[in-house]
């Protein structure tokens, strides 16, 4: 393969950009960016020569644009490669992953995502997660089932015994049931690797009356033993076919989110300018580019993605008249608004780091409205991984737009968009199927379901609005509808960015950001819950890290020892307006290096100071010692603790019946129950309903992320067992930071003291006199708890315990919040036992 150089500078630039001729060399320069080398590097001039090109021809920009548009429009199924399928049985060992993959082999050594390897590495990690998810669906395959009619177009099948709980795997309104007649099975048997049977088959598209036709329906409901599904009118085969024979039933995911992520990575591979933006150069390297100390041998110019970007001047603060005047007194919030409105750095995404209760949503809402006021031509996309995050921002925007006189006058004077088309909340069809009862009327009015009927909005409709709010997956659908072809949006706001994997965040960027004047703003907190990853292997290799987290660890975004950082790239919110100062102090010292400042009004957070059951009125945190037993339901990964559930309900009854003292009543809506396991949540819900408190909200830690309640009562469930996923410091951080006025933790201290963070919490509660347990002659506690001489038993067990590092449930937390999944951590994932069951099941079905 010969080396060919083009003479034209323009042609050289295109060849370099598309074929990534400098990727690896440039990244090598960036890797030496440590303190000992920076001065030396600044004085050097790097001469970079082009790599060999197969045919020596530059990539035509018109053809490249056509290829990008084709990528956006199409959404292939992205079946797993043969190499990845072969690596699955051995759980993706290093050897399997690095065979014929030099890029990933290097990544395993460095554990660094770079400009040149991000697409290849992320595709590998995403495939591991994809296959791990498909494994669970493969276990639900039913070789011979009868279909039972339950209503018009609605049917069900009864599941035979499986090693997984269908409720833990199958998603109603999103997943599908494929009914395969025996005639179709004979003509086209299932593949030996049953994971491939989860992909669409050609026989699904035959004529209805074809005996080999496979019938596809949408899952309606799922329980441990049954799956209910519904056909559309266009593909209903009729009762005579469905109830007259047995079927092989395949329960599968459409894999739509995975397919959007695969496509985003493909688009990123084709877009060096966007990759340059997502991997910003450190300051010393940018200076070298400015000073032309990086040169191309025999070439006329640097590629555009290496060229220096113009600096942007800040808009004077007096030019911004805030809609929410409270932001004037919050230096960090005001800084974020001014910086984004002025135009954040074009070197990389702008980050609003918002710890719990610091007003992140308030800041983002104000910024979006100021952009629409001061930059009428701006068009804004607001997106997040969850519907709840999208709804929160969209509702606050709608409230301002509908009630603020200044906004209404301003929008009335604009020709485009029209006053009634300032914002559109785009719901997915699946959300419409689930029901819109919980969606506020104002938000519903400004959505594609305004008449309680789902309306599929085309791109031409979206282009009529100033602000579009949609989940990341819905943005992926809009990209398929050619939204990217219009280069429409000037700003992309990704909320809860710390809770999305990097490929997930890319769904909201790729196909949308195609020019340097489209700004990306990431808001969130990477120290709270991240993305849910089913594969421990994928998580440990880096899939669990968010784009936001990676950027904050890079040189450009780092905070130095004196607390200084580049304010053109980020704002760090500090002032907590949610919780009692002692509650803030608890999670502030554990997770935020004491950077947060408690500023909630006393009247809002001192509600429990006169409560009879609070031993210390100045410290509204109780640790209720409970020595229950952790149990697990059959065929389920979820745990429950009967005694802790009873204790939770006892506290609820006392709070509602007795109030908080001095006439302060407590409603059911004031209390939030956090049950980290689904089984515990179901048990607590049942007990609360039986005692007449059905409106007390019970949810997981994930349910409460981004939310708050005056009173939070949490059951930690794990007792005389390993900590399970409660070992995660991010999970504990969310748990501690939801309560405004009162936090009650119910758990087993003997188990929890082996966890660094819970050990600290228990110690603090003991010091403050709020560590409580039942013993004779003491203050009233749940009468069903056994009498325990807690101090003596705890001291004895402590002195006789094993060394902490040898204890299975001990968690040594690093100073950095990010924790790589340990083999001992029992998350909802494919465990060793489950993997064996999968192998056996697949072997039996393929015989």
Question: Predicted regions span which residues?
Answer:
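Eukaryotic intrinsically disordered and solvent-exposed regulatory patches
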Residues: 162-166, 214-216, 323-324, 337, ...
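Conserved P-loop NTPase motor core of helicases/translocases
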Residues: 12-20, 323, 377-492, 531-542, ...
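Pre-Walker A (Motif I) flank of P-loop NTPase domains
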Residues: 345-352, 377-378, 466
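Pre-ATPase regulatory/linker segments immediately N-terminal to the P-loop/RecA-like helicase/translocase core
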Residues: 6-74, 79-88, 92, 151, ...
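Conserved helicase motor core of SF1/SF2 NTP-dependent helicases
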Residues: 386, 473-475, 482, 487-847
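Walker A/P-loop NTP-binding motif
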Residues: 361-376, 396-399, 510-511
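Phosphate/oxyanion-binding active-site loops and adjacent basic polyanion-contact surfaces
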Residues: 167-178, 328-333, 356-364, 389-390, ...
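Walker A/P-loop
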Residues: 346-367, 706
């Amino acid at each position: 393969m010969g080396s060919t150089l083009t003479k034209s500078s323009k042609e050289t630039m295109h060849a370099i950009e598309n074929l990534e001729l400098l990727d690896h060399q440039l990244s090598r320069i960036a890797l030496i960016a440590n303190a000992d080398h920076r001065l030396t590097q600044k004085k050097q001039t790097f001469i970079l020569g082009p790599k060999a090109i197969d045919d020596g021809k530059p990539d035509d920009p018109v053809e490249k644009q056509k290829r990008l548009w084709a990528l956006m429009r199409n959404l292939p199924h992205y079946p797993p490669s043969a190499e990845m399928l072969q690596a699955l049985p051995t759980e993706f060992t290093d050897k399997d992953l690095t065979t014929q993959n030099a890029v990933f082999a290097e990544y395993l050594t460095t554990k660094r995502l770079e400009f040149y390897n991000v697409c290849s590495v992320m595709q590998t990690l995403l495939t591991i997660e994809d296959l791990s998810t498909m494994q669970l669906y493969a276990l639900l395959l039913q070789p011979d089932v009868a279909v039972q009619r339950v209503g018009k177009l609605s049917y069900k099948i009864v599941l035979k015994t499986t090693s997984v709980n269908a409720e833990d795997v199958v998603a109603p309104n999103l997943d599908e049931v494929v009914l395969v007649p025996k005639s179709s099975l004979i003509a086209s048997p299932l593949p030996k690797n049953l994971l491939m049977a989860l992909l669409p088959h050609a026989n699904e598209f035959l004529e209805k009356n074809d005996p080999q036709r496979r019938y596809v329906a949408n899952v309606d409901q799922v329980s441990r033993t049954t799956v209910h599904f519904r056909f559309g009118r266009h593909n209903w085969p009729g009762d005579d076919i469905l109830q007259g024979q047995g079927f092989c039933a395949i329960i599968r995911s459409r894999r739509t989110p995975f397919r959007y992520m695969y496509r985003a990575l493909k688009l990123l591979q084709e877009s060096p300018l966007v990759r340059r933006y997502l991997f910003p150069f450190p300051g010393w390297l940018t200076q070298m580019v400015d000073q032309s100390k990086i040169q191309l041998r025999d070439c006329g110019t640097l590629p555009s993605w290496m060229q220096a970007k113009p600096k942007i001047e800040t808009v004077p603060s007096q030019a911004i008249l805030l809609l929410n005047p409270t932001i004037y007194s919050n230096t960090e919030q005001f800084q974020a608004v001014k910086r984004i409105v002025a135009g954040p750095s074009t070197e990389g995404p702008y980050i609003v780091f918002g710890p719990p209760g610091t007003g992140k949503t308030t800041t983002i809402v104000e910024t979006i409205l100021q952009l629409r006021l001061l930059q009428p031509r701006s068009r804004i996309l607001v997106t997040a991984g969850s519907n709840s995050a999208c709804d929160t921002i969209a509702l606050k925007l709608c409230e301002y737009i509908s009630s603020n006189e200044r906004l209404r006058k301003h929008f009335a004077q604009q020709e485009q968009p029209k006053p009634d088309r300032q914002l559109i909340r785009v719901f997915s069809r699946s959300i419409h199927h689930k029901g819109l009862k919980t969606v506020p009327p104002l938000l519903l009015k400004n959505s594609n379901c305004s008449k309680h009927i789902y309306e599929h909005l085309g791109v031409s409709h979206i282009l009529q609005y100033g602000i579009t709010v949609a989940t990341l997956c819905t943005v992926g659908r809009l990209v398929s509808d050619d939204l990217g072809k219009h280069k429409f949006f000037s700003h992309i706001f990704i909320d809860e960015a710390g809770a999305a994997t990097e490929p997930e965040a890319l769904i909201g960027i790729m196909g949308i950001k195609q020019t340097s004047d489209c700004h990306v703003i990431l808001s969130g907190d990477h120290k709270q819950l991240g993305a849910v990853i089913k594969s421990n292997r994928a998580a440990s290799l880096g899939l669990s890290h968010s784009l936001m987290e990676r950027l904050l660890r890079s040189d450009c975004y780092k905070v130095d020892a004196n607390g200084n950082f580049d304010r053109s790239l980020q704002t760090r919110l500090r002032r907590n307006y949610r919780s009692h100062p002692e509650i803030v102090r608890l999670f502030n010292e554990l997770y935020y290096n004491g950077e947060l400042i408690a500023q909630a009004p006393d009247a809002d957070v001192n509600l429990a100071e006169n409560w009879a059951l609070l031993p210390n009125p100045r410290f509204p945190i109780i640790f209720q010692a409970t020595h229950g037993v952790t149990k697990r339901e059959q065929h389920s990964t979820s745990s429950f603790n009967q005694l802790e559930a009873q204790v939770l309900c006892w506290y609820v009854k006392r709070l509602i019946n007795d109030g908080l003292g001095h006439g302060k009543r407590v409603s059911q809506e004031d209390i939030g129950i956090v049950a980290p396991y689904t089984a515990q949540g179901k048990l607590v819900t049942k007990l609360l309903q039986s005692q007449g408190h059905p409106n007390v909200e019970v949810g997981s830690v994930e349910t409460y992320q981004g939310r708050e309640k005056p009173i939070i009562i949490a059951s930690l469930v794990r007792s005389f067992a390993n900590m399970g996923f409660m070992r995660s410091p991010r999970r504990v951080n969310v748990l501690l930071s939801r309560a405004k006025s009162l936090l009650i933790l119910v758990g087993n201290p003997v188990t929890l003291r082996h966890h660094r963070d819970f050990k600290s919490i228990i110690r603090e509660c003991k010091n403050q006199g709020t560590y409580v347990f039942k013993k004779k002659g003491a203050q009233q506690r749940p009468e069903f708890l056994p009498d325990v001489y807690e101090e003596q038993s705890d001291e004895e067990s402590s002195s006789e315990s094993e060394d902490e590092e040898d204890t299975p449930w001990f968690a040594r937390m690093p100073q950095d919040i990010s924790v790589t999944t340990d083999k001992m951590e029992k998350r909802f994932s494919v465990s060793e036992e489950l993997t064996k069951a999968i192998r056996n099941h697949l072997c039996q079905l393929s015989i």
